[in-house]
Amino acid sequence: MSILLQGERFKKRLMPILLSMALAGCSNLLGSNFTQTLQKDANASSEFYINKLGQTQELEDQQTYKLLAARVLIRENKVEQSAALLRELGELNDAQKLDRALIEARISAAKNANEVAQNQLRALDLNKLSPSQKSRYYETLAIVAENRKDMIEAVKARIEMDKNLTDVQRHQDNIDKTWALLRSANTGVINNASDEGNAALGGWLTLIKAYNDYIRQPVQLSQALQSWKNAYPNHAAATLFPKELLTLLNFQQTNVSQIGLLLPLSGDGQILGTTIQSGFNDAKGNSTIPVQVFDTSMNSVQDIIAQAKQAGIKTLVGPLLKQNLDVILADPAQIQGMDVLALNATPNSRAIPQLCYYGLSPEDEAESAANKMWNDGVRNPLVAMPQNDLGQRVGNAFNVRWQQLAGTDANIRYYNLPADVTYFVQENNSNTTALYAVASPTELAEMKGYLTNIVPNLAIYASSRASASATNTNTDFIAQMNGVQFSDIPFFKDTNSPQYQKLAKSTGGEYQLMRLYAMGADAWLLINQFNELRQVPGYRLSGLTGILSADTNCNVERDMTWYQYQDGAIVPVAN
């Protein structure tokens, strides 16, 4: 009996020791309470987590902070820094290993290593993931599908992701990204897609089909969107509607009663103003909408706006000159209640309600060139820009668009002399298959002469600056440029049209004046579709200066027409 009692006493003394050992083992597997934050959303910046890393003495907590920082660095588009931080990790417990695996898959997806990312995800047990971690799992799946241009699979992954989100802002971001995927998908893919019994997918497909069906009829589109919300009251996108579509729910068709046209019609800018006015008036034709013209060379912009308001004018086209536009931008309250289509943009341009910016910007051409080269299969372009302010602006515009397309910087070089391009090409000869140059006709002819001897198969793309001779019969120049492609306004596409012939005669074939005329004509087109342009995402107009659309700040963008010098002729080519 005494032996049994001693045994019971021994068990009681041993139990706390065994329990503490068991808990220590669990801690090694699952980590401390702080490590459990890996199962939640990381809402701070990478800088915050890195600072915390330097303040903690606990090794386990240091690893957790590194994982949190690595996760956020990807969100901040600092993928290489995230990968480097993972390489610094020491010994991890099971909870940390699980989170590292999620981050590694996300890094692989960011690097377009899609098969690797998919295999890394397959190795994970979904049952061991928290809702927050599951949302990250499905986000990586969505990115892999998007990388593969499989937009429907990407949407399906984001639907699963949405089920695991708890934060309202993350819900909204996911809704907006899902909508962006559908908007970017080919209409044929959308029309042939099946909802596979997935009610959420069915709702999304119905929404994008309604959008595609009525994009050219904004009033009907607005009604269709409201009908969709009524038909799918429990859909995630009905609760948090895609931000891009919100303004369409209360869309009002453009209704212009009278227009104020603000142009320099005397002094130094007279020829610019009168040429734009001519294009505007010709496009107006027999329209009964009254147009009152204001000379910005004779009166201040503030006085003109006051006069327009007194006359009951609520729609303005202009001003043209940058200094006059800056007057409006310095005090936007003066145009409150008015629709304004400015005919320029300045460094101070920003998003202001009911104000859009339209001009013949060389930056538009650079973006069009990036699109064209990418569509032509160019992956490592050499971009030659003049060493001046124009070159810096256009080079930056090209690079921004190239980053969006390729995920990397373009090789932008700046020249002082046309001969400089030979050095640029020689430095990158093994990789460069195409050149985009902003240059005058004389400069481009000199560049091409050098390059023909060094890299005869180099594809050359140029801006409209190099096509200034295209409107005359300079056959020597055209022959020398054989094979060169250049962008310009579509107005020059049909040189036999009565409108072109009339304008060529009245301007003496002056290239820049013809472009300003086309700009004036498109200003009439744009102001009469002002609400559609501002409020309907993806709304496009076919104008004389390009295919016109507006970005989120209502900068009017122009998709250019591309031409090529071929055997002594200038012919349009596919964009």
From Swiss-Prot:
Gene Ontology molecular function: enzyme regulator activity
Organism expressing this protein natively: Haemophilus influenzae (strain ATCC 51907 / DSM 11121 / KW20 / Rd)
Top-level taxonomy: Bacteria, Pseudomonadati, Pseudomonadota, Gammaproteobacteria, Pasteurellales
Annotated protein name in UniProt: Penicillin-binding protein activator LpoA
The entry's keywords: Cell outer membrane, Cell shape, Disulfide bond, Lipoprotein, Membrane, Palmitate, Peptidoglycan synthesis, Signal
Membrane topology: Lipid-anchor
Gene3D superfamilies the UniProt entry points to: 1.25.40.650, 3.40.50.2300, Tetratricopeptide repeat domain (1.25.40.10)
Family: Belongs to the LpoA family.
Presence of the UniProt keyword Signal in the record: yes
Compartment annotation: Cell outer membrane
